[in-house]
Protein backbone atom coordinates (compact mmCIF):
# COMPACT_ATOMS: atom_id res chain seq x y z
CA UNK A 1 0.00 0.00 0.00
CA UNK A 2 1.71 3.17 -1.17
CA UNK A 3 -1.29 5.46 -1.61
CA UNK A 4 -3.44 7.75 0.48
CA UNK A 5 -7.13 8.35 -0.16
CA UNK A 6 -8.38 11.69 1.12
CA UNK A 7 -12.03 12.75 0.96
CA UNK A 8 -13.14 16.34 0.42
CA UNK A 9 -16.09 18.46 -0.67
CA UNK A 10 -16.76 18.10 -4.38
CA UNK A 11 -14.97 20.89 -6.22
CA UNK A 12 -12.10 21.23 -3.71
CA UNK A 13 -9.89 18.44 -5.08
CA UNK A 14 -7.16 20.82 -6.33
CA UNK A 15 -6.92 22.54 -2.96
CA UNK A 16 -6.63 19.21 -1.16
CA UNK A 17 -4.05 17.96 -3.67
CA UNK A 18 -1.91 21.05 -3.11
CA UNK A 19 -2.23 20.71 0.65
CA UNK A 20 -1.33 17.02 0.91
CA UNK A 21 1.58 17.45 -1.51
CA UNK A 22 2.93 20.29 0.63
CA UNK A 23 2.53 18.32 3.88
CA UNK A 24 4.19 15.22 2.40
CA UNK A 25 7.13 17.21 1.04
CA UNK A 26 7.66 18.79 4.46
CA UNK A 27 8.15 15.25 5.82
CA UNK A 28 10.55 14.31 3.04
CA UNK A 29 8.00 12.13 1.25
CA UNK A 30 7.54 12.61 -2.46
CA UNK A 31 4.75 11.52 -4.75
CA UNK A 32 1.96 12.89 -6.87
CA UNK A 33 -1.74 13.55 -6.46
CA UNK A 34 -4.30 12.04 -8.82
CA UNK A 35 -7.16 14.51 -9.18
CA UNK A 36 -10.51 14.05 -10.90
CA UNK A 37 -12.48 17.29 -10.82
CA UNK A 38 -15.67 17.19 -8.71
CA UNK A 39 -14.98 13.57 -7.65
CA UNK A 40 -14.95 14.37 -3.92
CA UNK A 41 -11.59 12.70 -3.25
CA UNK A 42 -7.86 12.73 -4.05
CA UNK A 43 -5.45 9.80 -4.35
CA UNK A 44 -1.89 10.67 -3.33
CA UNK A 45 0.60 8.10 -4.61
CA UNK A 46 3.97 7.87 -2.85
CA UNK A 47 7.07 6.86 -4.78
CA UNK A 48 8.32 4.54 -2.03
CA UNK A 49 6.53 1.59 -0.40
CA UNK A 50 5.66 2.25 3.25
CA UNK A 51 5.63 6.01 2.94
CA UNK A 52 1.83 6.25 2.74
CA UNK A 53 1.67 4.62 6.18
CA UNK A 54 4.29 7.05 7.45
CA UNK A 55 2.21 10.00 6.24
CA UNK A 56 -0.94 8.56 7.85
CA UNK A 57 0.92 8.52 11.17
CA UNK A 58 3.04 11.67 10.94
CA UNK A 59 0.66 14.17 9.33
CA UNK A 60 -1.59 15.48 12.10
CA UNK A 61 -5.06 15.00 10.64
CA UNK A 62 -6.53 17.93 12.57
CA UNK A 63 -4.03 20.21 10.82
CA UNK A 64 -5.31 19.28 7.36
CA UNK A 65 -7.77 21.92 6.21
CA UNK A 66 -9.48 20.39 3.19
CA UNK A 67 -9.35 16.66 4.02
CA UNK A 68 -12.38 14.93 5.51
CA UNK A 69 -10.54 11.64 6.00
CA UNK A 70 -7.01 10.20 5.72
CA UNK A 71 -6.70 6.55 4.66
CA UNK A 72 -3.83 4.30 3.52
CA UNK A 73 -5.13 2.38 0.50
CA UNK A 74 -4.33 -0.27 -2.08
CA UNK A 75 -4.37 0.06 -5.82
CA UNK A 76 -7.89 0.28 -7.20
CA UNK A 77 -9.45 -3.20 -7.17
CA UNK A 78 -11.64 -3.46 -10.28
CA UNK A 79 -14.07 -5.96 -11.79
CA UNK A 80 -15.32 -7.34 -8.48
CA UNK A 81 -17.91 -10.06 -8.97
CA UNK A 82 -21.46 -8.99 -8.18
CA UNK A 83 -21.98 -12.48 -6.69
CA UNK A 84 -18.99 -12.23 -4.32
CA UNK A 85 -17.27 -8.96 -3.50
CA UNK A 86 -16.28 -10.10 0.00
CA UNK A 87 -13.77 -12.88 -0.80
CA UNK A 88 -11.33 -10.64 -2.74
CA UNK A 89 -11.42 -8.09 0.09
CA UNK A 90 -10.70 -10.76 2.72
CA UNK A 91 -7.90 -12.17 0.59
CA UNK A 92 -6.30 -8.77 0.13
CA UNK A 93 -6.27 -8.10 3.87
CA UNK A 94 -4.77 -11.57 4.47
CA UNK A 95 -1.90 -10.63 2.16
CA UNK A 96 -1.24 -7.56 4.32
CA UNK A 97 -1.10 -9.40 7.66
CA UNK A 98 2.72 -9.42 7.74
CA UNK A 99 2.84 -5.63 7.74
CA UNK A 100 -0.59 -4.79 9.18
CA UNK A 101 -1.80 -6.03 12.58
CA UNK A 102 -5.43 -6.71 11.69
CA UNK A 103 -6.14 -7.91 15.23
CA UNK A 104 -5.78 -4.26 16.21
CA UNK A 105 -8.66 -3.31 13.90
CA UNK A 106 -11.78 -2.04 15.65
CA UNK A 107 -14.32 -1.42 12.87
CA UNK A 108 -15.00 -1.50 9.14
CA UNK A 109 -16.30 1.56 7.28
CA UNK A 110 -17.67 1.01 3.78
CA UNK A 111 -17.70 4.38 2.07
CA UNK A 112 -17.97 6.30 -1.16
CA UNK A 113 -17.37 9.89 -2.22
CA UNK A 114 -19.81 12.60 -1.15
CA UNK A 115 -21.21 13.52 -4.57
CA UNK A 116 -24.67 13.53 -6.13
CA UNK A 117 -23.54 10.77 -8.50
CA UNK A 118 -22.50 8.54 -5.60
CA UNK A 119 -25.77 8.72 -3.64
CA UNK A 120 -27.06 5.39 -4.99
CA UNK A 121 -23.65 3.89 -4.22
CA UNK A 122 -23.94 5.12 -0.63
CA UNK A 123 -27.10 3.03 -0.17
CA UNK A 124 -25.23 -0.03 -1.44
CA UNK A 125 -22.36 0.68 0.99
CA UNK A 126 -24.72 0.66 3.97
CA UNK A 127 -26.21 -2.69 2.94
CA UNK A 128 -22.82 -4.22 2.19
CA UNK A 129 -21.35 -3.26 5.56
CA UNK A 130 -23.21 -5.88 7.65
CA UNK A 131 -22.16 -9.04 5.74
CA UNK A 132 -18.62 -7.71 5.30
CA UNK A 133 -18.30 -6.97 9.02
CA UNK A 134 -19.46 -10.49 9.84
CA UNK A 135 -16.93 -11.99 7.43
CA UNK A 136 -14.08 -9.93 8.86
CA UNK A 137 -14.95 -10.94 12.42
CA UNK A 138 -14.84 -14.60 11.40
CA UNK A 139 -11.19 -13.97 10.55
CA UNK A 140 -10.57 -12.79 14.12
CA UNK A 141 -10.40 -9.13 13.08
CA UNK A 142 -12.35 -6.04 14.25
CA UNK A 143 -11.82 -7.06 17.87
CA UNK A 144 -9.29 -4.52 19.15
CA UNK A 145 -9.51 -4.11 22.92
CA UNK A 146 -7.99 -0.62 22.89
CA UNK A 147 -9.93 1.24 20.22
CA UNK A 148 -7.96 4.50 20.50
CA UNK A 149 -4.66 2.84 19.60
CA UNK A 150 -6.19 0.61 16.94
CA UNK A 151 -7.04 0.99 13.28
CA UNK A 152 -10.27 1.25 11.31
CA UNK A 153 -10.56 -0.73 8.09
CA UNK A 154 -11.96 1.13 5.08
CA UNK A 155 -13.47 -0.02 1.80
CA UNK A 156 -13.81 2.96 -0.52
CA UNK A 157 -16.09 2.18 -3.48
CA UNK A 158 -15.76 4.31 -6.61
CA UNK A 159 -18.22 2.05 -8.44
CA UNK A 160 -20.24 -0.95 -7.28
CA UNK A 161 -17.54 -3.29 -8.67
CA UNK A 162 -14.44 -1.15 -7.94
CA UNK A 163 -12.92 -0.16 -4.62
CA UNK A 164 -9.83 0.85 -2.72
CA UNK A 165 -9.03 -1.32 0.32
CA UNK A 166 -7.30 0.31 3.26
CA UNK A 167 -7.10 1.46 6.86
CA UNK A 168 -6.77 4.56 9.01
CA UNK A 169 -5.31 5.17 12.46
CA UNK A 170 -7.99 5.75 15.10
CA UNK A 171 -5.87 8.36 16.86
CA UNK A 172 -5.35 10.32 13.63
CA UNK A 173 -8.52 10.27 11.54
CA UNK A 174 -12.03 11.71 11.35
CA UNK A 175 -14.37 10.04 13.82
CA UNK A 176 -17.29 9.81 11.40
CA UNK A 177 -17.94 7.60 8.38
CA UNK A 178 -16.93 9.51 5.23
CA UNK A 179 -15.74 12.24 7.61
CA UNK A 180 -19.29 13.58 7.83
CA UNK A 181 -20.97 14.37 11.18
CA UNK A 182 -24.71 13.77 11.16
CA UNK A 183 -26.29 16.87 12.67
CA UNK A 184 -30.01 17.55 12.87
CA UNK A 185 -31.26 21.03 12.07
CA UNK A 186 -33.02 22.42 15.18
CA UNK A 187 -36.53 23.58 14.22
CA UNK A 188 -36.29 26.66 16.45
CA UNK A 189 -33.03 27.93 14.86
CA UNK A 190 -33.44 31.10 12.72
CA UNK A 191 -31.34 29.81 9.79
CA UNK A 192 -29.51 26.74 8.52
CA UNK A 193 -26.19 28.52 9.05
CA UNK A 194 -26.58 27.44 12.68
CA UNK A 195 -25.22 24.01 11.71
CA UNK A 196 -21.91 25.56 10.68
CA UNK A 197 -21.21 26.85 14.17
CA UNK A 198 -22.55 23.71 15.82
CA UNK A 199 -20.20 21.56 13.75
CA UNK A 200 -17.32 23.94 14.47
CA UNK A 201 -17.87 23.72 18.23
CA UNK A 202 -18.09 19.93 18.08
CA UNK A 203 -14.93 19.75 15.95
CA UNK A 204 -12.68 22.30 17.67
CA UNK A 205 -13.74 22.08 21.33
CA UNK A 206 -13.11 18.84 23.27
CA UNK A 207 -16.44 17.43 24.57
CA UNK A 208 -15.23 17.44 28.18
CA UNK A 209 -14.46 21.18 27.94
CA UNK A 210 -17.59 22.45 26.21
CA UNK A 211 -19.54 23.13 29.41
CA UNK A 212 -16.70 25.19 30.90
CA UNK A 213 -16.03 27.16 27.71
CA UNK A 214 -19.71 27.87 26.98
CA UNK A 215 -22.02 28.67 29.91
CA UNK A 216 -24.15 31.38 31.54
CA UNK A 217 -21.03 33.16 32.83
CA UNK A 218 -19.63 33.72 29.33
CA UNK A 219 -20.08 36.67 26.99
CA UNK A 220 -19.83 36.62 23.20
CA UNK A 221 -19.98 38.97 20.23
CA UNK A 222 -21.52 37.77 16.97
CA UNK A 223 -20.48 40.02 14.07
CA UNK A 224 -22.95 39.92 11.18
CA UNK A 225 -25.42 38.07 13.37
CA UNK A 226 -28.73 38.51 11.49
CA UNK A 227 -31.03 36.56 11.62
CA UNK A 228 -29.28 34.67 14.41
CA UNK A 229 -28.17 31.22 13.27
CA UNK A 230 -24.81 31.46 15.05
CA UNK A 231 -26.19 33.45 17.99
CA UNK A 232 -28.68 30.61 18.55
CA UNK A 233 -25.87 28.08 19.17
CA UNK A 234 -24.30 30.35 21.77
CA UNK A 235 -27.56 31.21 23.53
CA UNK A 236 -28.63 27.57 23.77
CA UNK A 237 -25.36 26.96 25.64
CA UNK A 238 -26.18 29.76 28.10
CA UNK A 239 -23.84 32.43 26.66
CA UNK A 240 -24.94 36.09 26.61
CA UNK A 241 -24.49 37.46 23.08
CA UNK A 242 -24.02 40.95 21.68
CA UNK A 243 -25.55 40.42 18.25
CA UNK A 244 -24.07 42.96 15.84
CA UNK A 245 -25.97 43.57 12.60
CA UNK A 246 -28.12 46.27 10.98
CA UNK A 247 -30.66 43.55 10.13
CA UNK A 248 -33.33 42.19 12.46
CA UNK A 249 -32.70 39.30 14.83
CA UNK A 250 -35.21 36.48 15.29
CA UNK A 251 -37.90 37.27 17.87
CA UNK A 252 -37.30 33.91 19.55
CA UNK A 253 -33.76 34.99 20.42
CA UNK A 254 -34.90 38.29 21.94
CA UNK A 255 -37.35 36.33 24.08
CA UNK A 256 -34.51 34.39 25.72
CA UNK A 257 -33.23 37.55 27.39
CA UNK A 258 -29.71 36.41 26.48
CA UNK A 259 -28.96 38.79 23.61
CA UNK A 260 -28.45 42.50 23.08
CA UNK A 261 -29.00 43.58 19.50
CA UNK A 262 -26.43 46.16 18.38
CA UNK A 263 -27.52 47.70 15.06
CA UNK A 264 -23.99 48.58 13.97
CA UNK A 265 -21.40 47.83 11.30
CA UNK A 266 -19.43 44.72 12.29
CA UNK A 267 -16.16 46.36 11.25
CA UNK A 268 -16.78 49.44 13.41
CA UNK A 269 -18.29 47.78 16.50
CA UNK A 270 -16.25 47.89 19.69
CA UNK A 271 -16.87 45.59 22.67
CA UNK A 272 -18.64 47.02 25.73
CA UNK A 273 -16.32 48.21 28.48
CA UNK A 274 -18.40 46.85 31.36
CA UNK A 275 -17.68 43.16 30.63
CA UNK A 276 -14.95 40.99 29.17
CA UNK A 277 -15.79 39.18 25.96
CA UNK A 278 -14.92 35.49 25.97
CA UNK A 279 -15.97 34.61 22.42
CA UNK A 280 -15.99 36.38 19.06
CA UNK A 281 -17.84 34.64 16.22
CA UNK A 282 -18.19 35.95 12.70
CA UNK A 283 -19.82 34.67 9.51
CA UNK A 284 -19.85 37.92 7.53
CA UNK A 285 -19.75 37.74 3.73
CA UNK A 286 -16.63 39.78 3.07
CA UNK A 287 -13.18 39.53 1.47
CA UNK A 288 -11.21 36.96 3.49
CA UNK A 289 -8.18 39.18 4.06
CA UNK A 290 -10.41 41.91 5.43
CA UNK A 291 -11.93 39.41 7.86
CA UNK A 292 -8.45 38.18 8.80
CA UNK A 293 -7.44 41.76 9.56
CA UNK A 294 -10.57 42.32 11.68
CA UNK A 295 -10.04 39.13 13.70
CA UNK A 296 -6.37 40.01 14.21
CA UNK A 297 -7.39 43.39 15.62
CA UNK A 298 -9.73 41.80 18.17
CA UNK A 299 -7.08 39.32 19.29
CA UNK A 300 -4.17 41.77 19.44
CA UNK A 301 -6.20 44.32 21.40
CA UNK A 302 -7.36 41.60 23.80
CA UNK A 303 -11.02 42.17 23.04
CA UNK A 304 -11.75 38.42 23.09
CA UNK A 305 -10.13 35.20 24.28
CA UNK A 306 -11.39 32.77 21.65
CA UNK A 307 -12.86 33.10 18.19
CA UNK A 308 -14.55 31.02 15.51
CA UNK A 309 -14.97 32.67 12.13
CA UNK A 310 -15.41 31.88 8.47
CA UNK A 311 -13.24 32.93 5.54
CA UNK A 312 -15.22 33.07 2.29
CA UNK A 313 -13.36 31.67 -0.73
CA UNK A 314 -15.01 32.71 -4.01
CA UNK A 315 -11.65 33.12 -5.78
CA UNK A 316 -9.78 30.61 -7.97
CA UNK A 317 -6.59 30.28 -5.88
CA UNK A 318 -8.39 29.21 -2.71
CA UNK A 319 -5.57 27.34 -0.97
CA UNK A 320 -3.16 30.22 -1.61
CA UNK A 321 -5.71 32.68 -0.20
CA UNK A 322 -6.18 30.56 2.92
CA UNK A 323 -2.42 30.41 3.48
CA UNK A 324 -2.11 34.18 3.09
CA UNK A 325 -4.95 34.89 5.53
CA UNK A 326 -3.69 32.51 8.21
CA UNK A 327 -0.14 33.79 7.84
CA UNK A 328 -1.44 37.36 8.14
CA UNK A 329 -3.07 36.53 11.48
CA UNK A 330 -0.12 34.49 12.76
CA UNK A 331 2.37 37.24 11.90
CA UNK A 332 0.39 39.90 13.78
CA UNK A 333 0.01 37.72 16.87
CA UNK A 334 3.65 36.62 16.84
CA UNK A 335 4.78 40.24 16.46
CA UNK A 336 3.02 41.00 19.77
CA UNK A 337 4.46 37.83 21.39
CA UNK A 338 0.95 36.48 21.87
CA UNK A 339 0.73 32.71 22.37
CA UNK A 340 -2.17 31.08 20.58
CA UNK A 341 -3.69 27.88 19.25
CA UNK A 342 -4.99 27.93 15.66
CA UNK A 343 -6.93 25.36 13.65
CA UNK A 344 -8.71 25.67 10.32
CA UNK A 345 -11.09 23.23 8.64
CA UNK A 346 -13.31 23.00 5.61
CA UNK A 347 -16.23 21.60 7.59
CA UNK A 348 -19.02 19.53 6.08
CA UNK A 349 -21.55 22.36 6.47
CA UNK A 350 -19.17 24.90 4.94
CA UNK A 351 -19.53 25.62 1.24
CA UNK A 352 -17.22 28.11 -0.50
CA UNK A 353 -15.53 28.90 2.82
CA UNK A 354 -13.46 27.48 5.64
CA UNK A 355 -13.89 27.80 9.40
CA UNK A 356 -11.04 28.98 11.63
CA UNK A 357 -10.67 28.61 15.40
CA UNK A 358 -8.16 30.60 17.46
CA UNK A 359 -7.63 30.54 21.21
CA UNK A 360 -5.27 32.82 23.10
CA UNK A 361 -3.12 30.86 25.53
From Swiss-Prot:
Enzyme active site: 312 (proton acceptor)
Where S-adenosyl-L-methionine is bound, by residue?
193, 226-229, 245, 265, 283
InterPro entries annotated for this entry? RlmM_FDX (IPR040739), RlmM_THUMP-like (IPR048646), RNA_MeTrfase_FtsJ_dom (IPR002877), rRNA_MeTrfase_M (IPR011224), SAM-dependent_MTases_sf (IPR029063)
Q: Which reaction does it catalyse?
A: cytidine(2498) in 23S rRNA + S-adenosyl-L-methionine = 2'-O-methylcytidine(2498) in 23S rRNA + S-adenosyl-L-homocysteine + H(+)
Query: Does the keyword field hold Flavoprotein?
Result: no
Q: Where in or outside the cell?
A: Cytoplasm
The record's top EC class is: transferase
The answer on whether this UniProt entry bears the keyword Glycoprotein reads no
The alphabetized UniProt keywords are:
Cytoplasm, Methyltransferase, rRNA processing, S-adenosyl-L-methionine, Transferase
- SUPFAM superfamilies cross-referenced by the UniProt entry: S-adenosyl-L-methionine-dependent methyltransferases
| EC number(s) recorded for this UniProt protein | 2.1.1.186
Q: Which GO terms describe its cellular component?
A: cytoplasm
Q: Output the Gene Ontology terms for molecular function.
A: S-adenosylmethionine-dependent methyltransferase activity
**Pfam families the UniProt entry points to:** FtsJ (PF01728), RlmM_FDX (PF18125), RLMM_N (PF21239)
Q: Which GO terms describe its biological process?
A: methylation; rRNA processing
- What role is this protein assigned? Catalyzes the 2'-O-methylation at nucleotide C2498 in 23S rRNA.
Similarity field: Belongs to the class I-like SAM-binding methyltransferase superfamily. RNA methyltransferase RlmE family. RlmM subfamily.
The UniProt subunit note reads as follows: Monomer.
Q: What is this protein called?
A: Ribosomal RNA large subunit methyltransferase M
Task: Give the species this sequence originates from.
Answer: Histophilus somni (strain 129Pt)
Lineage in the entry? Bacteria, Pseudomonadati, Pseudomonadota, Gammaproteobacteria, Pasteurellales
Amino acid sequence: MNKLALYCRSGFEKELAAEITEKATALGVFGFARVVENSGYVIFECYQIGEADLLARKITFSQLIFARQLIVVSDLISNLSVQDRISPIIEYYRQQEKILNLKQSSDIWVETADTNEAKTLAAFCRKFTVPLRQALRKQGWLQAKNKKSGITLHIFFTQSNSCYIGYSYNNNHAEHIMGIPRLKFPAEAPSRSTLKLEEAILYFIPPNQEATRFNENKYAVDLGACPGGWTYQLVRRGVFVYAVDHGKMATSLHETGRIEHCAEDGFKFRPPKHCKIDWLVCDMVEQPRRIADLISQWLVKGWCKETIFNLKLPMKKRYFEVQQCLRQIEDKLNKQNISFQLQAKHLYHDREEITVYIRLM
